[in-house]
Amino acid sequence: MEKKNNKYTALLNVMKRELRRLVSRPLYLFCMVIAPLFCYIFFTTLMDSGLPTDMPVGVVDRDMTATSRQLVRNLDAFEQTAVVARYPDISDARIAMQKGEIYGFYYIPEGTADKAQAQRQPKVSFYTNNTLLIAGSLLFKDMKMMSELASGAAARTALYAKGATEEQAMAFLQPIVIDTHPLNNPWLNYSVYLCNTFAPGVLMLLIFMITVYSIGVEIKDRTAREWLRTSNGSIWISLAGKLLPHTAVFFLMGILYNTYLYGFLHFPCNSGILPMLLATLCLVLASQGMGILMIGTLPTLRLGLSFASLWGVLSFSMCGLSFPAMAMHPVLQGLANLFPLRHYFLIYADQALNGYPMIYSWMNYVALLVFMMLPFLVARRLKEALIHYKYLP
């Protein structure tokens, strides 16, 4: 019983020691509170309108007929497209696009209206700057749709001239009517799409960095032996006492972004907020386990921080947010499972978007549990480094 009390006393002593370190170094306040708050507000306000609107495009109208002017007016009527300039030729439009004045331009050659009326298949062209992926993709969609509508309008006029009724003409032009219903994010809101992963991703990256830093700086400042003595020589009490205050702060920041996204901004959360809070707690603990593995594998502050930053940044690409994992190379599909953010993203898709029961995500919860167990692999090596390693600047 006395031995058990000694363990609790040692744990409390390590926690008090760590709390003193947290309040004495502004770096902890910045990385654990200020930086996450800034990122939450920055990303959500950056994309507060959901989709970009009124993106500037140009027009090269060499036809100069009522038909071409109607085509330009219809293009300008799209929510995401704004016709801001007209150019005499393609060269001027290309130069404007290279300067960044417009994201694309629509080219209507001379004789387009006459060829359309004579059913000689006139050709229109459009060019988009796909260096900017979102702007280029959205404008490409609008310009392509405008071209298809113009083609349909010309064909409909020809059918009317041949005596077809409106019902007959529409049945010929569109024999199958498509009724589209996007699921889970029907507004196609980029903020919903990105912020639900950016917020936990940034938090995960900061947990990596702070976990590695808080242990590595003990080695750098040669206070590691004092830290171990405070825990009566137990590496597990040392780690628990050091990281429990971190866990509490980071989980509070996780509760904050969940409340902000699902309570204040009303992002889709079809299974309720409690499963997402559990997933957030699992992500925090898994990230801390991963951080211990990083500093245990490379017990040097600069190498450990490099490992943490590299792994954290790669997580945004490998989690399947920007590019679907199922479309990756099979080797990369396997490697994606080595990133905690990947499993959090899948839990988010199942719980918040689809509203499935938690049992459907059990494999991802188990994966996060495995990340929590990673310190068992490096505990002995880390203890030896704390006792014997000499920091070389």
Predicted regions located by residue number:
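Residues that define the loop-to-transmembrane-helix transition and helix capping
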Residues: 26-27, 236, 302
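Hydrophobic alpha-helical segments typical of transmembrane helices
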Residues: 67-71, 211, 223, 347
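Alpha-helical membrane-protein architecture signal
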Residues: 8, 12-16, 188, 192, ...
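Residue-level signature of the transmembrane alpha-helical core
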Residues: 15, 33-37, 198, 243, ...
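Hydrophobic alpha-helical transmembrane segments of multi-pass membrane transport proteins
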Residues: 38-41, 181-261
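Membrane-spanning alpha-helical segments of multipass transporters and channels
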Residues: 64, 259-260, 268-393
